[in-house]
Amino acid sequence: MILMIDNYDSFTYNLVQALEAAGANVRVLRNDAIDRAGLEAMADDPAAELRGIVVSPGPGDPDSAGVSMDAVRVAVERRIPLLGVCLGMQAMGAALGATIRRAPTLVHGEASSVRHDGKGLLAGMPTPFMAARYHSLSVAPETLPADVIVTARTEDDYVVMGIRHLSAPIEGVQFHPESVLTPEGPHLLANFLRLAGEGEASLLDRASGSFALAGFATEPSAAGAPNRPDRPIEPRTAAAAGAGRAEIVR
């Protein structure tokens, strides 16, 4: 079973629909419908068959995202595969001690060119690829702890688009893999299902490059952004203080 933490977002059920199309059993809980103790009990209950967690996009910031940050902490402690999407990635960063700050530009429904390291959930995806963005906050990379790395950035303004924990099976992406503006998004979701051991990931692999035709999401398409010269994904590393509430720089 994949647990979807719904941060009251319209994109949540696009994610659910895509995962279910690949045969995954998805249970959706609003971010205020369960607490950390409930997550721990679910993780420890063999009958629940919890194989992975997705923390959905949503409005606001990590501190207003209910159980989202605790979901990240439980996933790290229990080694449960977790994917954070948009606000979900910000919750991942904040839970692990990073600062969440204003993005250089507010982006709503635009496609950006994203370059990545080709590992983890990004394995097998072209670089760069076009990805949908809807956000005004971003993870400050210099505040990530040493065991969390940047995996993807936009080519134009170099905003962090992906992070990965080095010792736990959790990753976050700032872009929306479930959007028709991210044609390669199904492959990322397929990689997550493979990591979690849930569903038939190959069904999503076949949709890669034609997400709109597969019928998983419905936004209009957008023009692509120009490519930029190759740059490293991770320009520097820095340790951060322990996790608590999210530090939001406004």
Language-model segments: residues:
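Catalytic beta-strand/loop cores that center a nucleophilic Ser/Cys/Thr
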Residues: 120-168
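Short gly/ser/thr-rich secondary-structure transition/capping motifs
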Residues: 28-34, 112-115, 131-134, 153-156
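Histidine-centered divalent metal-coordination motifs
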Residues: 86, 135, 176
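Generic structural signal for residues in well-ordered beta-strands
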Residues: 26-28, 100, 150
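Cysteine-nucleophile active-site neighborhood
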Residues: 42, 49-124, 128, 189
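Structural signature of beta-strand start/N-cap positions in the alpha/beta core
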Residues: 1, 25, 51, 81-83, ...
